[in-house]
Amino acid sequence: MPKANLDLLALNRGLVSPLALARVDVERTRLSAAEMTNWTAKTQGAMRLRTGDVYLGSSLSDAKAGWIPFVASTSDTALIELTDQKMRVWVNDALITRPSVSTTISNGSFATSAGWTDASTGGGVVTMSGQLILNGTNINGAAIVTRQITVAAPDQNIEHALNIIVAGGPVTFRVGSTSGGQEYIAETTLLTGNHSLAFTPTGDFHLTFRHGDIYPVYLSTIAVASAGVMEITTPWPLLDIPGIRSDQSADVVFVACGNALSSPVGSSFHTPRRIERRGTGRSWSVVLYQPDNGPFVPERTSKAKLKVSATFGNTTLTASENFFTSAHVGAIFRLFHTGQNGVFRFGSADAYSPAWEVNGIGAATERRSTIVTTGTWTANIRVQRSFDGPDEGFRTVQTITTNTTTNIDDADDNVTVWYRLAIPVTADYTSGTAIATLTYTGGGVTGICRVLAYNSATTVTVNVLKRFSLTEYTDNWNEGQWSDKRGHPTSAALFEGRLWWFGGSQAFGSVSDDYANYDDETEGESAPIVKTIGRGPVDSVYWALPLQRMLLGTAGQEIAMQSSSLDEPLTSQNTAARTISTQGSADVAAVVVDTRGIFVQRSGKRVFMLDFDLNQGTHQAQELSLLVPDLLDSGVVSLAVQRQPDTRFHCVLGDGRVAVLTFEKAEEVLCWAVVETDGFVEAAIVLPGTDEDQLYYHVRRVINGQTKRYLEKFSLERECHYPQTIYSGTSTSSITDLPYADGTAVTLRDASGVKLENQTVTGGTITLASPVTWAEITPSRSGLVDSAKHGTQSASATITGLSHLEGEAVVVWADGKSFSPIASGVQTTFTVSAGQITLPETVQEYSVGLGYSAPWQSTKMAYAAAAGTALNQIKRLDHIAFILYETHNGGLFYGRDYDHMDCLPQVRKGATVRGTEIFNTYDELSYEFPGSYDTDSRICLKAFAPHAATVMAAVPSLRTEDKI
């Protein structure tokens, strides 16, 4: 009858598949677990009861939500909540909420011009008739409206917010304490979309809207925000939110949404968006991302010819045959015409036309430019020439002062020069608007327009973004790559100074360091990059990871966007897309961990890591879920990565559980465990922190018969696991060198467990109301409860403010002790009624929430055999010893199964354990284990919130009866 003391010294090996339980020959299997729920593995080897979480609030209307972490720095973060076509923002764990003010803006829908002042300059035009239309009209013209808003004395020095809807931007906006000032909101550009802009006026404030380009922009409404939570309208319906992919640069989040089921193959109907933050973090916008200069399809997409009705402003784009559809609204078109003609309107000084390039031979032929001036005006229009380029070196060579036809004959044959028209200084302009029409047959002009409205299959209304040369048909045109007609990108990422968009098996990289520029006429290595990716069927790009190389995930393969050498930046000339894995990806956002990428395989039930292999010179796919093939059977619906205090991947499953992988490659830690709560986890989100990252779950719970969805934030480990301090010495009113953070509430009790008083730690010291010679000092509150409320109150047995847990059985830790002990397997709980519970004694500091248990079961204890293997042999575990750390005396139960369990012995070193005692360290001789003779002997452990438990090692004694 051989006997052995087994050593379970590493409890961070985690779950293993039932298919591997017979592999007792493998060391990893011996240290693994058949069940590991609500235990958190530490990279050092221990496991501890997972932390609980705090109730923060509900998502909008308790609806399912998507979440985008916003990280400006580790100390400047926010959570963006997306529900059905709505966005809210959580800052410092609270929703941005607008205060109540009586300030209003009458005629904020611009039904008439009442209340608004037209302050336009240089011929700018303002129109108000159900919306505000601003048009610069002339070169250097500016359409400007202003308004003074009265703020009553009680509303001064209280935050105001302006809700602004821009129907067609960009609009320049500022708010000041003086007319035209920007003391409250510095001048900013409002793109097409919805804005909520906050500021705090000390008195009346002044609004200024401005637009200086020669095409119209449209503002729908402006209003002072009503009291309540900030809500901003978005385009994303609930079903499409899981398809959102984003990346962030400073205060801007670039968003693609690729989950529209009716969109073109591999693409989306959702135009890319920008989520913008301004100022102190209380101003937010959701606006269109619409580059004005690309990307374009290389060849025209129809045999139709196109022409514009005017070369600038708001005009009509006409096709020679049926071509346009309503899905073209928002699309851009580029048309090329020979000749460099133009119509330039001048209505002020400091006005310069675009330059035109002159070359060829013959002053009166190839090198002749003709200017026809019309209108009512008094000014000096200077004809200027440059030999240096289109942007510098101009000198006046001729002056036009009246309506006439002027020929500019350049005699420098075969010399390239540039001309422009200008009214450069104030002295050159007196009044009126001069219209100068240029005709020059040399060269050519590429104009760009954006479709505003669909009229028919042959005409659409457009805004001219870049001037055209002629109003004649041309077959030299290109359609933009992105539109509702052609589809939009499905993923976005920032990499090597470029903003990348992916969709429809194509990759689009912006001009370097210019995220809204896709001008394919840009020269050199900074030029934009447009590449076809993948092979075989057209695939959606489900995710993009900027690692050493840009990695992409599609349904059929994983792809690396790479240059000709590892450290060479991507350019339009050296970029290639190469397959690095054929696992295929699920439509789940992947995550980055240092230089590695973590993604969900095509089945949705396996998790892989892409790690760079120096020997292969590329990334290799390695399965992380290999040892637990059944764990993810319900499907992974989202991923989040936590880096501190350990690296953990939170894989939210389709059954409401979370599979958590603790990972540390250098220490060969790969530990799967499960998190369960009394609810259904729908999302996990991580924001960076200093000592520990901030982890959030969005949990669906049924409370009092109603479905609720709560945002809950996990407590820090130091708020859940902590030492208990014993003071023993001379009578004192000041106890120093306490191991608790500043602000920690602690409770002092005597040796009988009677409460003495509560105090708050400052600089490791507490000052007592009454001196003591002996005291047990314990943090008053505990983070080991779910959906918790932590609070402070005057001494009372009643705890209120628990309406979010109405009808639920809750557990309580208050004034440094548990009110929810476990006896005979049953835990003491309290049922919330009318939002409150009543305890058997008064308390001041409390933590109340849902309880949870943490079962752990070993693999087969098939060891200590003298005649070969111990598998299928009768054996019995009869003793066990533990090494514990910061564990409550009632915090750990052990047994052969979950129905036969003992608590830790309540006598230690010959003394009875205090009922409130926490074992800071625990290293005792073995004691009896309630085992039985069986061929399959196991160890089962179980911990119960709110009792701390950290297991560093277990040493069971096993007796085996060999049968030969």
What are these model-derived regions, one by one?
Residues 1-100, 269-312, 339-342, 455-457, ...:
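N-terminal beta-propeller domains
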Residues 2-99, 237-240, 536-539, 582-585, ...:
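Beta-sheet repeat architectures centered on beta-propellers
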Residues 65, 82-85, 231-273, 552-553:
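Elongated alpha-helical scaffolds
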Residues 96-110, 121-140, 153-155, 228-231, ...:
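Autoprocessing Asn-cyclization modules and mimics
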Residues 99-227, 352-369, 377-382, 387-392, ...:
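Extracellular and organelle-lumenal recognition/adhesion modules and their flexible linkers in secreted
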Residues 146-147, 185, 341-363, 386, ...:
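Short Trp-Ser/Thr-centered turn/loop motifs at beta-strand boundaries
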Residues 192-200, 235-245, 359-362, 395-440, ...:
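Beta-sandwich interaction modules
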Residues 215-222, 427-442, 947-961:
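Edge beta-strands of jelly-roll/beta-sandwich modules across compartments, strongly enriched
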